[in-house]
C-alpha cells in the first residue's frame, strides 16, 4: 500500500507516519506539509530518529504521482485542495479532517463519484462501536430523558463542537427520528428558560493536552445514564486510518465511513 500523509509535521501526521512505517504492508511514499512549514525538506522519519528517504514537501502533484492513498487529518481548506489533486491522479483518500461546511461536504460527495473516499470525524474502533451503543440507548430513552453531549479536547483544537460530538449527536438524533440540525443547542448563556425536552445539548471544553473525551448524558428523573469514550493516545486514530486504507484497497469509487469499514451497518 503506497501511502502519503498530509499534515506530516503535526501531532496526528507524525503518529500516522509512525503507524505506516511500522506496518509491513504499507510503504510511505509522500509527506505533505503547508507551504510555510519550517520542516519542509526534512526527512519524514526524523522525529522518530529514522531515515525514510521521504522529504516533507508542499508539492501536491509530486506526492500524488507516487501514492495510491492519501491519509489526511488537516484542515478543511487544505483537504479540499488535496481532493482536487487526488482527482487528477486517481488517488484514494482517507479523511479525518473536521469542521467542513455543507458546501465542502458536497465537494467530497461529488469527488466520491470518481474515487474511493473514507470520510469519518473519528476513526477509532472504540468511538464507532460507541455510536452503535448510543443508537440503542436513544431508542430506549426516548421519553423522559434529557440528552446532553459534553466533549473535551486540547487547547489547540480550533473547531467546536468536535466532529466526534456531532457524529454522536447525529447517531442519537437519527435513532429518535429527528434531524440534528433542528434539535441541537450549542452552549447556553444567560436566562435561557426551561429546557426543551426535544433538544440535544452540546458543551465543549478546551484545555491542556486532552486527546479527546466524549460523554453522552441521558438524564431522567431519579437516574441518569452516561456513555463515555476517552482517548488517551492518537494511536487508535492512526490504526483506524490504516484499516480504512485496507478497506479502500478492495473498493472502487464511493463515499464510505468507519461504520462501513468496521462492518457495523
UniProtKB/Swiss-Prot annotation:
It is found in: Cytoplasm. One of its GO terms (molecular function) is 4-hydroxy-tetrahydrodipicolinate reductase. Its EC number is 1.17.1.8. GO terms for cellular component: cytosol. NAD(+) binds at residues 7-12, 33, 96-98, 120-123. The keyword Acyltransferase does not apply. Coiled coil: none annotated. Its main location: cytoplasm. Pathway: Amino-acid biosynthesis; L-lysine biosynthesis via DAP pathway; (S)-tetrahydrodipicolinate from L-aspartate: step 4/4. It catalyses: (S)-2,3,4,5-tetrahydrodipicolinate + NAD(+) + H2O = (2S,4S)-4-hydroxy-2,3,4,5-tetrahydrodipicolinate + NADH + H(+); (S)-2,3,4,5-tetrahydrodipicolinate + NADP(+) + H2O = (2S,4S)-4-hydroxy-2,3,4,5-tetrahydrodipicolinate + NADPH + H(+). PROSITE patterns: DAPB. GO terms for biological process: diaminopimelate biosynthetic process; lysine biosynthetic process via diaminopimelate. The active site is at 153 (proton donor/acceptor), 157 (proton donor). PANTHER family: 4-HYDROXY-TETRAHYDRODIPICOLINATE REDUCTASE 1, CHLOROPLASTIC-RELATED, DIHYDRODIPICOLINATE REDUCTASE. Catalyzes the conversion of 4-hydroxy-tetrahydrodipicolinate (HTPA) to tetrahydrodipicolinate. Belongs to the DapB family. This is 4-hydroxy-tetrahydrodipicolinate reductase.
Amino acid at each position: 500500500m503506497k501511502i502519503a500523509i498530509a499534515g506530516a509535521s503535526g501531532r496526528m501526521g507524525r503518529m500516522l507516519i509512525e503507524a505506516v512505517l511500522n506496518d509491513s504492508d504499507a510503504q510511505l511514499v509522500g509527506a505533505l506539509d503547508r507551504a510555510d512549514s519550517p520542516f519542509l525538506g526534512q526527512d519524514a522519519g526524523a522525529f522518530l530518529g529514522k531515515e525514510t528517504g521521504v522529504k516533507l514537501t508542499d508539492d501536491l502533484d509530486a506526492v500524488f504521482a507516487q501514492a495510491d492513498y492519501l491519509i489526511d487529518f488537516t484542515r478543511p481548506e487544505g483537504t479540499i485542495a488535496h481532493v482536487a489533486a487526488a482527482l487528477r491522479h486517481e488517488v484514494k483518500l482517507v479523511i479525518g479532517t473536521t469542521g467542513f461546511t455543507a458546501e465542502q461536504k458536497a465537494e467530497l460527495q461529488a469527488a466520491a463519484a470518481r474515487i474511493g473516499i473514507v470520510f469519518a470525524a473519528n476513526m477509532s474502533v472504540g468511538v464507532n462501536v460507541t455510536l452503535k451503543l448510543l443508537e440503542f440507548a436513544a431508542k430506549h430513552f426516548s421519553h423522559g430523558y434529557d440528552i446532553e453531549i459534553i466533549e473535551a479536547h486540547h487547547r489547540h483544537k480550533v473547531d467546536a463542537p468536535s466532529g466526534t460530538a456531532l457524529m454522536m449527536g447525529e447517531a442519537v438524533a437519527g435513532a429518535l427520528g429527528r434531524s440534528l440540525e433542528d434539535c441541537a443547542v450549542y452552549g447556553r448563556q444567560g436566562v435561557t428558560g426551561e429546557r426543551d425536552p426535544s433538544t440535544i445539548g452540546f458543551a465543549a471544553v478546551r484545555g491542556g493536552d486532552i486527546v479527546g473525551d466524549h460523554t453522552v448524558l441521558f438524564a431522567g428523573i431519579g437516574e441518569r445514564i452516561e456513555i463515555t469514550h476517552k482517548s488517551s493516545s492518537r494511536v487508535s486514530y492512526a490504526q483506524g486510518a490504516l484499516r480504512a486504507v485496507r478497506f479502500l484497497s478492495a473498493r472502487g469509487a464511493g463515499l464510505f465511513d468507519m461504520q462501513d469499514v468496521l462492518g457495523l451497518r
